[in-house]
Amino acid sequence: MANTPGAKKAVRKIARRTEVNTARRSRVRTFLRKFEEALASGDAGAAKAAFVQAQSELMRAVSKGVVHKNTGARKVSRLAARLKKLSAA
């Protein structure tokens, strides 16, 4: 339990940041799911549009510190590879 006023304030700040970061992470997952659905449909155009949105959202999460830089880069790379595979087919 936080005893000092500074510690109590830190607990409040952490709670607020956790809420914001959870919302950001959820938003990233939503865009990733939309990309997955576009891939499953087999429509290259829709998949490309969904990829651009998912990439943008992932990189925004990286810049906000919600996702580590390397994790974001790895996810984008894998999404791009899957999009390329669909476009080639």
UniProtKB/Swiss-Prot annotation:
| RNA-binding keyword on record | yes
- An MF annotation (GO) of this entry: small ribosomal subunit rRNA binding
Q: Cross-referenced SUPFAM superfamilies, in alphabetical order?
A: Ribosomal protein S20
Q: Domain of life here?
A: Bacteria
Q: Name one Pfam family in it.
A: Ribosomal_S20p
Q: Which UniProt keywords are present, listed alphabetically?
A: Ribonucleoprotein, Ribosomal protein, RNA-binding, rRNA-binding
Q: Name any GO cellular component annotation.
A: cytosol
Which BP terms in the Gene Ontology apply to this protein? translation
What does the record give as the function of this protein?
A: Binds directly to 16S ribosomal RNA.
NCBIfam families named in the record: S20
Q: Which HAMAP family match?
A: Ribosomal_bS20
**Family from the record:** Belongs to the bacterial ribosomal protein bS20 family.
Its protein name is Small ribosomal subunit protein bS20
